[in-house]
Amino acid sequence: MWRWTNRATCLVIRAAATSATPFGICFGGIEKPRFLHRLDRETSGVVLVARTAEAARAGREAFVSGAVRKIYQVLVEGGFPSGTVHAAGWMAGEPDSLVRKRRRFFPEKDGIRPPAGDGDVRCCRTTFRLQARRGPLSLVVAVSKTGRLHQIRATLSALGFPVVGDKIYGVDETLFLRFLSDELTAADRSALRLPRQALHAAGLRLPHPVTGTLLRLRAPLPAEMVELRNSFFS
């Protein structure tokens, strides 16, 4: 009923994907793969699809009900604190940004709500746990309790630990504009450290749609993240 793959970055997920597309090939020629969730363009990792409409309904119900545990590994700039960080609040637009699709995280603990006129406000919850910390970088595990656009990236940026290689929420959002116009300089690429954002969907845990057995889907870190991690943490 369901199939999954370890998606490479920049392989776009589209509702109209067919067996002739890269994703159709990944899933063994499924004629109309029904994607149960999405990843940002530069995020790698586990992607789950349904073979049938019935399986798609069951899968989407699991995501909506919170029965799915979404686990990410992420390299961030800065020394992330030890222990567990619970980040709850709201995700809203950022109209003053040069990047139209940029989002802003408003932490619940600060008591600051998004502007009343913003019609695209969503509550969000993410838990972060430090895995390793060395020099200017930290390796963090993130568990997304909600599935908001750019949730992990915007939250980490608001906390002061932007994702390595993130052109929108990283060291300078104008990097994204230069990236779009193919004008990134050598200094820009050095500041980014990686040509992609270092965010990886490492695993999903969810009940099987028929048996109810807990499924544990895992995807290893891609080579470029492993190489950067090892250069600092080995």
Give, region by region, the residue ranges found by the protein language model.
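RNA pseudouridine synthases
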Residues: 1-234
